[in-house]
Regions:
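Transmembrane beta-barrel domains of Gram-negative outer membranes and organellar outer membranes
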Residues: 1-195
Length: 195
């Protein structure tokens, strides 16, 4: 199976100090399998992120993200319901520009079926400075389905970021699945712009 998604766009808009609005644009997705091709838009989402605490001693920088999917996608790529998500994100700056971070979140979803289940997502990443403009990262993340028969999915990925200027960053990533039901290989490129 081959899958392609575009644009993977997330708009982050500062509302007031320590509060941002987050709007995820639906992706146009194509899935090619032997004998069948499906394409169309996925669901989008809307949410907010609240900054809870700055890094202080052993305490990391903390943020809480509350969001909900918007069921606007094609049937093959939509749950046809509003699926709420709550995520705790953390980051910790180490010496010499190194950093670690991660998140843990839970989503209530029906996966397009009749019964709702809880899906947890979790990640841990390390950031590595290479030059003033170039950085690298490596990340582990996973998905577990608490009240569903689906098996957990686990992934590793890494990539590079290039800071063109203070308002523009380019990135590239590549990763692979660690479990049988995970995607074998994936890659992507991105562009971050600050207005």
């Amino acid at each position: 199976m081959d899958q392609f998604e575009l644009p993977e766009a997330l708009f982050r808009i500062g509302l007031i100090e320590n509060l941002e609005l987050r709007i995820e644009v639906p992706n146009y997705t194509t899935v090619d399998t032997p004998g069948d091709n499906v394409d169309g838009f996925s669901d989008g989402s809307i949410g907010v992120k609240v900054h809870l605490a700055d890094q202080n001693g052993a305490l990391p920088d903390l943020g809480l993200i509350a969001s909900a999917s918007l069921p606007v996608g094609k049937e093959a790529f939509s749950s046809d319901n509003v699926d709420p998500t709550l995520t705790l994100a953390w980051a910790y700056d180490l010496d010499s520009g190194y950093s670690i971070g991660g998140n843990v979140g839970v989503t209530s979803s029906d996966g397009g079926g009749d019964d709702r289940f809880l899906e947890t997502a979790y990640s841990f990443a390390a950031g590595i400075p290479l030059t003033e403009s170039w950085s690298a990262y490596v990340e582990y993340y996973g998905l577990s389905f608490l009240s569903s028969d689906e098996d957990s999915e686990h992934y590793m990925n890494g990539g590079f970021t290039y800071l063109v200027n203070n308002n523009l960053q380019l990135d590239w990533r590549i990763g692979f699945g660690l479990t049988d039901n995970s995607d074998d290989l994936f890659t992507g490129a991105g562009l971050s712009v600050r207005f």
